[in-house]
Amino acid sequence: MSTGGDFGNPLRKFKLVFLGEQSVGKTSLITRFMYDSFDNTYQATIGIDFLSKTMYLEDRTVRLQLWDTAGQERFRSLIPSYIRDSTVAVVVYDITNVNSFQQTTKWIDDVRTERGSDVIIMLVGNKTDLADKRQVSIEEGERKAKELNVMFIETSAKAGYNVKQLFRRVAAALPGMESTQDRSREDMIDIKLEKPQEQPVSEGGCSC
């Protein structure tokens, strides 16, 4: 029933939440995808940021709602509510920081606690431009993804490497989630309009 009528329906919306430790490049990946740019000045995300982009696929057009979460411990209590109605969780680590890689297991566990198996999870090893400082091999990333039954890709937000491919692969996986999306579409529209009151810090509403 959900096939065939796509073009007559309002634009389908899918919520992607970006998770991972501080400074792994979550904001940079979103900025590269949204604006094809990279800011060398690091600025920590304060609370939760939200951006939206229309993506044109071969068979339909979708709107991706990109939720950028803070990696700092003090904001962790906010994150489960954003995971709860997500269609996709993008869990990012820094290939030059083995601890950020080890912590992805916890982030993926958090996603599954909130969403069960009813979610697409993409594990992303970012900062391949710093290959000389690599602490996590691509084989280790692939192995963890296989063990945890998630998708995997390596990227460089700085160089633009594989960023479009990351979103293409996520988009290609979306049709299997249509029933979930239909069920949560109204909630997602409400959330989009809220711009969460949970943001605890008044300054720094934008940390792109």
Swiss-Prot record:
Motif (Switch 1): 32-50
Gene Ontology molecular-function annotations: GTP binding; GTPase activity; myosin V binding; protein domain specific binding
Entry binding sites for GTP: 23-28, 39-40, 42, 45, 71, 126-127, 129, 156-158
Residue list for modification Cysteine methyl ester: 208
Necessary cofactors: Mg(2+)
Modified residues (N-acetylserine): 2
GO cellular component assignments: acrosomal membrane; ciliary basal body; cytoplasmic vesicle; cytosol; endomembrane system; endoplasmic reticulum membrane; endosome to plasma membrane transport vesicle; extracellular exosome
Superkingdom field: Eukaryota
Modifications made to the protein after synthesis: Prenylated.
A Gene Ontology BP annotation from the UniProt entry: antigen processing and presentation
Effect annotated for changing residue 46 to E: Loss of RAB6IP1-binding
Reaction catalysis annotation: GTP + H2O = GDP + phosphate + H(+)
Compartment annotation: Golgi apparatus membrane; Cytoplasmic vesicle, Secretory vesicle, Acrosome membrane
PTM annotation (Phosphoserine): residues: 184
Modified residues (O-AMP-tyrosine): 82
Key words of the record: Acetylation, Cytoplasmic vesicle, ER-Golgi transport, Golgi apparatus, GTP-binding, Host-virus interaction, Hydrolase, Lipoprotein, Membrane, Methylation, Nucleotide-binding, Phosphoprotein, Prenylation, Protein transport, Transport
Membrane topology: Lipid-anchor; Peripheral membrane protein
Positions occupied by motif Switch 2: 69-88
Lipidation (S-geranylgeranyl cysteine): 206, 208
Enzyme Commission number, as recorded: 3.6.5.2
Subunit details: Interacts with BICDL1; leads to its accumulation in the pericentrosomal region. Interacts with SCYL1BP1. Interacts with VSP52. Interacts with RABGAP1. Interacts with GCC2 (via its GRIP domain). Interacts with RAB6IP1 (via its RUN 1 domain). Interacts with TMF1. Interacts with CIMAP3. Interacts (GTP-bound) with APBA1/MINT1 isoform 2, also called Mint1_826, but not with isoform 1. Interacts with RIC1; the interaction is direct with a preference for RAB6A-GDP. Interacts with RGP1; the interaction is direct with a preference for RAB6A-GDP.
Function: The small GTPases Rab are key regulators of intracellular membrane trafficking, from the formation of transport vesicles to their fusion with membranes. Rabs cycle between an inactive GDP-bound form and an active GTP-bound form that is able to recruit to membranes different sets of downstream effectors directly responsible for vesicle formation, movement, tethering and fusion. RAB6A acts as a regulator of COPI-independent retrograde transport from the Golgi apparatus towards the endoplasmic reticulum (ER). Has a low GTPase activity. Recruits VPS13B to the Golgi membrane.
Domain comment in the entry: Switch 1, switch 2 and the interswitch regions are characteristic of Rab GTPases and mediate the interactions with Rab downstream effectors. The switch regions undergo conformational changes upon nucleotide binding which drives interaction with specific sets of effector proteins, with most effectors only binding to GTP-bound Rab.
Protein name in the entry: Ras-related protein Rab-6A
Gene: RAB6A
